[in-house]
Amino acid sequence: MMTKEDYLNEYKTHKSMRDNVKRDNYRLQYHLMPPTGFLNDPNGLFQKDGVYHIYFQYTPFTAGWGTKLWGHYTSKDMINFNQEEPFLYPDISLDRDGVYSGSAFVEDETIHYFYTGNVKLTDREDYDYINSGREQNTIHMTSKDGYKISEKELILSNDDYPIDMSKHVRDPKIFKKNNYYYMVLGGRTSDNQGCVLLYKSKDLINFEYYNRIEVDDFGYMWECPDLFELDGELFLVVCPQGISQRGYDYANVYQTGYFKVDYDFDNNTYKISEFKELDRGFDIYAPQSFLDEKNRRIQYAWMGIPDAEYNNQPTVDYCWQHALTMPRVLSYKNNQIYQQPLDEMKNLRLEKIVSNCKNIKQKDTVVYEMQVDFDKSQDFVLQIRDDVQLSYLNHVLLFFVDIIQKFLLPFLYFQDILVYLHL
């Protein structure tokens, strides 16, 4: 457990850690990073009264995995962010081993938060952290301002999940339809099949099991589900674990993508499309979206991945690790989800350089945006740096980055579609 008082007391002893972070040349210029320590999933995203609230999984005193808090940033323009005090602490018995991922739902001027309280029963003889020895408590509380919260209350526990589920059920997200509230939870069955559990409520407090969304033999665990409507269609974004690579498909450690869902809520039946990856970059996981006051569906994700073979030692040496992706505005057309940077990002632009030369001298800056126009479609190789390359060969667009031992690895690809890469 860690109360706010525990955090503040330990914070006083880590000045050298904060000083190390300030000295690091690898700190990013326009991505949200942990002030110190380790960041992963974005959580509880919303905008209220003109203020964006961005929470995230946060381990403040180590640059690796540890007991999770919720970190907190706020912004009025999505360009300038304020670092707030941590928002949630593992300070009750129901979340003593970490306040895991969750979400926010705003209605009638009240913010409803839902998250998974993690409890490890390591003293039990049958403890294996998969099928026994773990509590996955779904916890709810409210707030009027995004800072002060009501008392935490348990709304779902292990006994409320289907009997064939393992102890891996987590990451609640709320979706409203026809005056009912639906909660999705990522899950893993006892026989290692990934799925999403669907619960239904009239009041955001009392939830009853409603259904599950699943696909045969498609991973052993589905994490971080997000069910939402976009341009008149219903989508389920999810992160399946345990899918084998097929050519360029599913090349990441774990996948991040979506299903288009045709759900008949009157009869509680559904049809589901094939899974499509949202992003083929290697550092992408646990996306979460929200509607802002301009009615834009904005998505953040963790710019990292669990269990990666490579590490981030250069930043770990300076006592921090990972960041959130740039926020993306989602839309649906041509039978796929499109992702574009926020218009607000244009406000980061400074001097414009126009060049028709083959070689462009780099300006004295660590960040730049490159726009390249082609007058006809043909194969090309664009060498951005010695270790970064963009190519279009045989109808496949590949982005390469030098990750390991000066060998260019394919970082993402698109095939025969219009793309905008923001480098």
Question: What residue spans do the PLM features occupy?
Answer:
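Blade-edge beta-strand/turn elements of extracellular beta-propeller
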Residues: 22-32, 76-92, 143-162, 202-218, ...
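Beta-propeller blade signature
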Residues: 69-77, 128-146, 195-204, 250-266, ...
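Membrane-spanning beta-strands of outer-membrane beta-barrel proteins
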Residues: 97, 133-136, 167, 220, ...
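Blade-loop segments of beta-propeller domains
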Residues: 67-108
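A compositional/structural signature marking long, glycine- and acidic/polar-rich segments
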Residues: 186-290
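N-terminal regions that are enriched for targeting/export leaders
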Residues: 1-52, 58
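Hydrophobic core segments of beta-strands in well-ordered, beta-rich domains
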Residues: 41-61, 85, 100-130, 138-140, ...
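Beta-rich accessory regions
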Residues: 13-17, 254, 260-423
